[in-house]
């Protein structure tokens, strides 16, 4: 028996809604048809955020509580009036992506299970020059909402100082987004460079509230994710619905609303009435086009002062001028910080290597090494054999890998039960949950920073629980082909993140 459908006529075009009664938000009781009707109620504002922009389809086909999959290639059975644009990804591959231009297109993608819409910051007519700089305020765990709002106001000041206008909106999740309309005459790397300069300027203005540090283990407060402006990165657009139990919405705000705004106030149920009564707070964005020249001058001053590039996302080829792409907890420490006798690769410093080798051969195992603390001068004995291992400056261990966030959090709960004394010392920011990028879907890992745990209580690295392998369903031939493609583009390994390359 065929699944029931509801046919909607939107701007003279028929859009079929399959399984209209399917529950998408179990706790709130909202159905797929409710989702489609919501988007139609805010269509002018929602289309403004995506019009003319290619987008990947993030599909929650079994509702908000299911794991989404990302479909970059436009479905073959799309309606003839749905536009596409051909994008080239960092991997070198291409795909025809959907371009939504009107309310009918909005309803059509909603029927596919797209709760949040993820357009690129470029228009289909010019895929190499973004016309939008995106500021993503991403709080570390435990940061209060009030602090995120405070940082947003600092961003406004920083933008104004370089002649730019920001358009804020709640992310619908934990943060705030601020979009900046710019002239489409800069490349992706140049826009990212400007975003990094902005992040650093905000950090200078509010050093206790904000950070531009890429590595999670170094962050505090609210992170300004400058890498959201790298090519192929996207953020949820205005009026997107997020996969949370209350069907929260990414809602545009006026600047005078930001200091008192509460993210939970904006949901699938409440936003249509708010929108009907006050309109779209972001409606003027296309009339506020700005230049990046002044912000790029800030970047040039930073670089002249020795503040160069910052790390790129792991799936990008190594960039000119980029610092080593190594987590601080895994970085090799300067020679002066090594323990006595721990030279490069586990040997002594090169200038005494030959002397020490000769002395050891002559029967003195401690030749060339300083006395061990607490032992009398001239003591002869044996020292532990150097292992060549680095001593991490930040003690981070990995707890779990899984296909869903819920599974890694459950694994972390089991770890806490095994190590209650260590768990008692953890702060919210010490628990690092990362959305990783698989070949065709997202997966998750959870790590713990033990910096606040006394050394005597720090557990060692254990087997992961659970230990998910994102490649388990991939044939050896497919994996080899994928790795070869990454190696050809800068020696990269498969580096999962939250969205696939192809």
Where are these predicted regions, by residue range?
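Signature for HUH/AEP ssDNA processing cores
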Residues: 98-171, 182-190, 348, 354, ...
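A short linear hydrophobic-aromatic micro-motif
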Residues: 163-168, 209-211, 427-432
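Short secondary-structure junctions
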Residues: 48-50, 159-165, 206, 420-426
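Short beta-strand
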Residues: 58-60, 166-172, 212-216
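C-terminal accessory nucleic-acid interaction domains of nucleic acid-metabolism proteins
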Residues: 1-29, 36, 47, 51-52, ...
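Acidic/polar low-complexity segments and flexible, solvent-exposed patches
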Residues: 338-502
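A contiguous, low-structure linker/loop signature
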Residues: 66-120
């Amino acid at each position: 028996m065929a699944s029931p459908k509801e046919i909607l006529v939107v701007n003279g075009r028929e859009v079929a809604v399959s399984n209209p009664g399917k529950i998408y938000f179990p706790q709130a009781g909202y159905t797929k048809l409710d989702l489609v009707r919501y988007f139609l109620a805010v269509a002018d504002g929602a289309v403004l955020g995506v019009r003319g922009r290619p987008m990947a389809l993030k599909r929650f086909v079994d509702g908000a509580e299911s794991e989404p999959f990302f479909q970059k290639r436009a479905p073959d059975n799309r309606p003839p009036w749905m536009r596409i644009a051909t994008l080239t990804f960092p991997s070198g591959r291409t795909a025809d992506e959907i371009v939504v231009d009107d309310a009918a297109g909005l309803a059509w993608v909603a029927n596919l299970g797209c709760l949040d819409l993820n357009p690129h910051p470029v228009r289909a007519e010019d895929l190499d020059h973004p016309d939008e700089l995106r500021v993503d305020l991403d709080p570390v765990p435990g940061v209060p909402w009030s602090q995120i709002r405070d940082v947003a106001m600092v961003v406004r000041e920083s933008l104004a100082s370089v002649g730019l206008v920001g358009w804020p909106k709640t992310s619908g999740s934990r943060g705030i987004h601020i979009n900046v309309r710019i002239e489409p005459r800069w490349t992706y790397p140049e826009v990212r460079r400007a975003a990094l300069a902005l992040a650093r300027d905000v950090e200078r203005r509010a050093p206790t509230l904000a950070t531009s540090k890429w590595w999670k283990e170094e962050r505090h407060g609210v992170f300004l994710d400058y890498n959201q402006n790298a090519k192929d990165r996207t953020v949820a657009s205005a009026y997107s619905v997020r996969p949370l139990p209350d069907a929260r919405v990414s809602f545009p705000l006026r600047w005078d609303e930001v200091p008192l705004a509460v993210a939970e106030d904006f949901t699938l149920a409440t936003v249509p009435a708010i929108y009907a009564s006050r309109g779209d707070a972001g409606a003027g964005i296309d009339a506020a086009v700005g230049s990046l020249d002044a912000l790029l001058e800030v970047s040039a001053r930073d670089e002249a002062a020795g503040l160069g590039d910052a790390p790129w996302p792991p799936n990008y080829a190594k960039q000119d001028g980029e610092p080593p792409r190594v987590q601080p907890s895994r970085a090799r420490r300067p020679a002066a910080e090594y323990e006595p006798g721990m030279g490069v690769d586990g040997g002594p410093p090169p200038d005494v290597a030959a002397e020490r080798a000769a002395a050891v051969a002559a029967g003195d195992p401690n030749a060339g090494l300083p006395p061990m603390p607490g032992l009398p001068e001239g003591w002869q004995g044996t020292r532990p054999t150097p292992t060549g291992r680095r001593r991490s400056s930040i003690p981070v261990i990995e707890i779990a890998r899984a296909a869903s966030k819920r599974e890694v959090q459950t694994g972390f709960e089991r770890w806490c039960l095994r190590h209650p004394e260590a768990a008692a010392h953890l702060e919210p920011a010490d628990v690092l949950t990362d959305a990783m990028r698989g070949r065709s879907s997202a997966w998750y890992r959870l790590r713990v920073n033990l910096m606040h745990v006394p050394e005597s209580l720090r557990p060692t690295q254990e087997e992961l629980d659970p230990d998910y392998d994102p490649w388990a369903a991939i044939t050896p031939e497919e994996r080899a082909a994928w790795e070869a493609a990454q190696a050809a583009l800068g020696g990269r390994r498969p580096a999962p993140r939250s969205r696939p390359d192809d």
